[in-house]
């Protein structure tokens, strides 16, 4: 893992070396081992590339970046890992001269030989920029699922890119740094911005499975190089692999884990005690010659959020070298640090334990495998149960159940079963997509106008959000409702929340995180499996649990899914109570330039009185307030 940054100037201005170094070094947490820059101020456009290195493969200085070929006419800055780099190197024809054993250098020569087609040949997680001096092109690419981030800013004079927004901001003048107020509604609904936008006007995320080509004249083209939709459309209606014990699944996941054990530094695994991380740990233990170092985290004050007992069961089963940590409410002291690493407000409070478990792991290893992606591929979330169940109901029955929802009283805890049933029933009156959107929302789409000031709600904002999600179904209308929901989740929540969180929190601690479940071959295979093998009535991840039943301890196979959350309900009635009040009830609160004070105060009071659990909503609003204060000061986020 590393950090990349760069600037391309289309006019006669030259790249400022000091500013390029500053933009690169602001990413030092992503790459503490080495850093350097490359500048070409002789050509048009002018090009500056910066790199911070976290050494994982080939620890020698010869693998440092920016890196070039033997002719010095192809340059690269690269963040990530390419798992098939040794095979690709062997496939390259004669005439290539290597100075290192790194995967980065293979990309350089692969581009020399295949041009843009080289991108689709890469198996791994990556974000990189290539400067082709012969054609004066800049190519910036991102991996298929979005494990590695790329942000960019472009106007008529320049193109700027970076692994994090903070690197992009270093190149901008203060008058160019403008808040994107239109990001607030989608943030309040889902906890992240979309599509591809950020809280800064003009700064965007490059979509996963896409690359951009910037030509000498400044024209920019963005292309998609991989599409999961085409795989979904190739699925046979009567697949031959319809067994709950699936040897092909076993083979593909084992291969995905094995290739992610390539490393010249110590590695381990995050172990929550859930199905996915337990399977990954079990497979690792078969391939490694020493005990797997595993890391888990829990919450002492709320058993609903504490999985450490399950993690210990798995650790004992595989004789791992296990380390655990208990999070206390004092973890809120990390909020400012997390905001710095996110560069934006963040709605997913599980960033806190993710940061802490990454910090714990980094004491012992430089690489950690995780279970991310298992829920996304094999229908592990309750939203998939709700979606499939509701779509199978006749319309009249949905209407009856919707009326019944008003008989269920509000609960003090969001995770309480009556709360979940009430939420499920309340959304039954809506069309399929909006039903799903409201189930995954923090604040329901229809309730946003209660919180956000009218002048901020641009016309058709609601339709725009719905149509964005709806657009993901175009081309796979024939697929089952479950497949459609899995695909939407794969294209939105996975890259825009889950993977951003894992990247930021791991890299904040100079830790590389690898996700075997997000292996391309496994993803494509999983989407060919019939629904009944993923969701068997209300049994989630059905085929996964059965295929690996010999690995999974019985207690893990049949345990209730807890999720990697934070006890916000208790925190906002305890340690966070006065902290939140100090920011949200102040005369200097920034959020009330955008939100209605009365609506926010009502949330806070209802939560404190135990009338409802608004912990998730309060976290969303609190982090927005903290970010706004920092932004208004003009200091770096």
State the predicted function of each range.
Residues 18, 179, 244, 248, ...:
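Generic recognition of stable, solvent-exposed alpha-helical segments in well-folded globular domains
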Residues 129, 347-358, 397-403, 586, ...:
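Short, basic, helix/turn surface patches
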Residues 144, 356-420, 493, 498-522:
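Active-site adenylate/phosphate-handling loop in enzymes that bind or generate adenylated species
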Residues 302, 326, 345-348, 412, ...:
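Alpha-helix capping and helix-loop boundary segments enriched in small/acidic/polar residues
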């Amino acid at each position: 893992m590393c950090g990349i940054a760069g600037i391309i100037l289309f006019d006669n201005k030259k790249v400022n070396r000091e500013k390029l170094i500053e933009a690169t070094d602001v990413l030092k947490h992503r790459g503490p081992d080495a850093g350097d820059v490359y500048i070409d101020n002789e050509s048009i456009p002018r090009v500056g590339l910066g790199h911070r290195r976290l050494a994982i493969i080939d620890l020698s200085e010869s693998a440092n970046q920016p890196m070039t070929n033997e002719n010095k006419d192809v340059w690269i800055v690269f963040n990530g890992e390419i798992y098939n780099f040794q095979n690709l190197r062997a496939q390259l024809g004669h005439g290539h001269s290597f100075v290192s054993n790194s995967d980065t250098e293979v990309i350089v020569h692969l581009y020399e030989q295949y041009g843009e087609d080289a991108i689709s040949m890469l198996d791994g997680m990556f974000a990189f920029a290539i400067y082709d001096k012969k054609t004066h092109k800049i190519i910036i690419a991102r991996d298929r699922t979005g494990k590695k981030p790329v942000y960019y800013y472009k106007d008529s004079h320049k193109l700027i890119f970076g692994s994090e927004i903070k690197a992009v901001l270093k190149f901008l003048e203060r008058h160019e740094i403008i808040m994107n107020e239109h990001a607030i509604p989608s943030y309040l609904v889902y906890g992240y911005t979309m599509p591809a936008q950020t809280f800064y006007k003009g700064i965007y995320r490059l979509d996963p499975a896409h690359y951009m080509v910037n030509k000498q004249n400044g024209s920019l083209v963005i292309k998609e190089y991989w599409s999961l939709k085409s795989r979904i459309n190739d699925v046979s209606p009567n697949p031959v692999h319809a067994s709950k014990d699936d040897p092909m699944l076993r083979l593909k996941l084992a291969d995905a884990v094995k290739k992610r054990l390539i490393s010249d530094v110590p590695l381990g695994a995050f172990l929550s005690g859930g199905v996915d991380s337990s399977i990954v740990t079990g497979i690792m233990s078969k391939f490694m010659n020493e005990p797997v170092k595993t890391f888990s985290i829990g919450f002492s004050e709320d058993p609903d959020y504490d999985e450490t007992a399950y993690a210990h069961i798995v650790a004992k089963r595989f004789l791992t070298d296990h380390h655990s940590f208990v999070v206390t409410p004092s973890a809120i002291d990390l909020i400012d640090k997390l905001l710095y690493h996110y560069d934006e407000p963040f709605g997913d409070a599980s960033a806190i334990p993710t940061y802490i478990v990454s910090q714990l792991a980094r004491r012992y290893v430089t690489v950690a495998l995780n279970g991310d992606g298992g829920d996304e591929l094999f229908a592990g979330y309750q939203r998939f149960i709700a979606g499939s169940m509701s779509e199978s109901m006749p319309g009249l029955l949905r209407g009856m159940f919707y009326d019944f929802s008003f008989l269920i009283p509000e609960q003090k805890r969001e995770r309480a079963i009556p709360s979940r049933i009430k939420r499920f029933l309340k959304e039954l009156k809506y069309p399929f997509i909006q039903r799903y959107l409201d189930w995954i929302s923090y604040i329901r789409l229809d309730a946003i106008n209660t919180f956000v000031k009218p002048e901020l709600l641009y016309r058709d904002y609601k339709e725009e959000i719905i149509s964005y999600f709806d657009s993901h179904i175009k081309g796979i209308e024939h697929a089952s409702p479950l497949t459609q929901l899995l695909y939407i989740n794969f294209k939105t929540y996975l890259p825009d929340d889950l993977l951003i969180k894992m990247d930021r929190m791991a890299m904040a601690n100079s830790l590389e995180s690898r996700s075997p479940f997000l292996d391309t071959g496994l993803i494509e295979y999983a989407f060919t499996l019939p629904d009944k093998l993923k969701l068997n009535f209300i049994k989630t991840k059905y085929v996964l649990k059965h295929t690996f039943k010999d690995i999974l301890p019985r207690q893990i196979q049949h345990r209730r899914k807890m999720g990697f959350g934070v006890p916000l309900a208790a925190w906002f009635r305890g340690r966070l109570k006065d902290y939140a009040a100090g920011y949200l009830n102040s005369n200097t609160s920034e959020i009330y330039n955008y939100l209605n004070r009365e609506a926010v105060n009502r949330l806070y009071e209802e939560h404190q009185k135990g009338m409802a659990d608004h912990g998730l909503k309060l976290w969303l609003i609190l982090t927005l307030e903290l970010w706004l204060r920092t932004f208004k000061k003009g200091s770096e986020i």
